[in-house]
From Swiss-Prot:
A GO term for molecular function: beta-carotene isomerase activity
Cofactor(s) the protein requires to work: Fe cation
Tissues expressing the protein: Expressed in hypocotyls and shoots. Expressed at low levels in roots.
GO cellular component, one term: chloroplast
Entry keywords, A to Z: Chloroplast, Iron, Isomerase, Metal-binding, Plastid, Transit peptide
Biological process annotations from GO: secondary shoot formation; strigolactone biosynthetic process
Protein name in the entry: Beta-carotene isomerase D27, chloroplastic
Major location (coarse): plastid
Phenotype of the disrupted gene, per the record: Increased shoot branching.
Compartment(s) of residence: Plastid, Chloroplast
Pfam families attached to this UniProt entry: D27-like_C (PF13225)
Length: 264
């Protein structure tokens, strides 16, 4: 039988073959079979295939993370504070980070976004007593030095929560300073795989807490394409309704939405 391939069909076949070659390094085969059709190359099915591949790769990476003894204490402490603030308990048999994500997921499932912010803020207040936060606020008023110290402290102290990060240079009022934290791949976003949990359990309440309790404005800018995030100390965030992150639809394969019915 003679079959003629159009240009778009050829591109689809080539893309699928390349995708299988990439996956073969993991000793797995893609479930996508080369199909000849007249749809555009960047079709919905190929988008879904790419996202499935990203999720599987992320899960493989997460499985390799080994938290230190002190990291586990910090993770479980934050998880317990969030459970107490929301009046819930985690049913996860696992401890450490999986339980933290499970707790955050249950908060997202059972409460509206305003309540989510309140519970996270309450848990952060429990973790950092007012006396200590007030001292930090007085000792480090907004300045080039304090912004750089906040950035440095974040990279050193919070790898257990967000993953590896680094301090990057930026320009503030015409002067260069190292006050931006770049998170290569946010651990929380990667493991929860949920835009709604990123914005309402992490980003928004963290911005509010750091500014109100520690006196330091901060704007967190997640990139939902590569799961990276920038924390820009000293920069005021836009209003919640104007924040680009709030207009981002959740991933098609959002595990939290499918498993728990999380509302976005």
């Amino acid at each position: 039988m003679n079959t003629k391939l159009s240009l778009s069909q050829t591109k689809i076949f080539t893309f699928t073959t390349w995708f299988n070659d990439t996956r073969s390094g993991l000793d797995r085969r893609s479930s996508i079979s080369p199909t000849l059709c007249s749809k555009p190359v960047y079709s919905g099915k190929l988008k879904a295939a790419k996202e499935t591949a990203r999720i599987e790769t992320s899960n493989t990476k997460n499985a390799s993370i080994e938290d230190s003894f002190f990291s586990k204490i910090a993770i479980n402490y934050l998880s317990k504070n969030l459970q107490d603030a929301a009046g819930i308990s985690s049913s996860s048999k696992s401890t450490d980070y999986d339980r933290l994500v499970d707790t955050a997921t249950r908060v997202s499932r059972n409460f509206d976004t305003k309540q989510q912010h309140e519970f996270v803020l309450s848990s952060l207040d429990r973790a950092l007593p007012t006396v200590i936060s007030s001292l930090i606020k007085m000792a480090f008023p907004p300045s080039k030095v304090s912004r750089e110290l906040f950035a440095l402290f974040t990279t050193i102290s919070f790898a257990w929560l967000v993953g590896p990060s680094e301090v990057r240079e930026t320009e503030v009022n015409g002067r260069k300073e190292k006050s931006v934290v770049y998170i290569e791949k946010c651990r929380f976003l990667e493991q929860s795989n949920c835009v709604g949990m990123c914005t309402h359990i992490c980003k928004i309440p963290s911005q509010i807490f750091i500014k109100n309790s520690l006196g330091m404005p901060i704007y967190m800018e997640p990139d939902f394409n590569d799961l990276s995030c920038k924390m820009m100390f000293g920069r005021e965030p836009p209003e919640i309704e104007d924040d680009p992150a709030m207009k981002q639809p959740c991933f098609e394969f959002c595990k939290s939405n499918k498993s728990y019915g999380v509302k976005h």
